[in-house]
Structures are given as structure tokens and as C-alpha cells.
Amino acid sequence: MTSNALYELFRRRLPRAPVNTVMFLTRRTRDGFCGRLTSIATNSHYTMFVLDHGSVRIERPSQSEVDCASLMETLKRIRLRNSWVASEDELDVSRGDA
């Protein structure tokens, strides 16, 4: 499956609207674990990051691979910094959170 087709599938099937990236990262930095990155899909305009098998999705304009790498590094830093807040096996993203 091409990334464009995967992006369209995620966009149609994931139940929630995308969350604001800045608000999500700010809240997670303050409050704790951000969940596991489970998928990335892209089309010609946007890149979608899916966390915890669809509990949260983040969409960003597809500008460059550097943008994607910087978001992934931020997610890793949050995960390491807040590893004491939630265990690896816990899903931190609640249904009413996003």
C-alpha cells in the first residue's frame, strides 16, 4: 500500500479529528507519557502521525523529512523525561483527552 493510500485510509477510519501538535506536545511535556508512535503516513500535503493505534493522530504539513524527524525526537524526549509517570505497558492517552 502506498503512503498516500495509507494516509487516506487513516484519515477515513480513525475516529477522532487530528489534535493540535503544539497543544499536544505542551500538555504531554507537562503531564506525562505521550504514547507509542504506531504509524506514519503521508500524502503530497500532510504527514499523519498515529499514536497508540489510533487513539491520537497528529497531522502536520509535509514540508520536509527534517520536520518529521524533529517531531519524532520531541516525542522521544517526552517519553524519556516522563518515563517515571507511566509504565511502558500503560496506555496514557485516554478517550476524552484529545
Swiss-Prot record:
It comes from the Viruses. InterPro entries: DUF5500. Belongs to the HHV-5 UL19 protein family. This is Uncharacterized protein UL19. It comes from Human cytomegalovirus (strain AD169) (HHV-5). The gene is UL19.
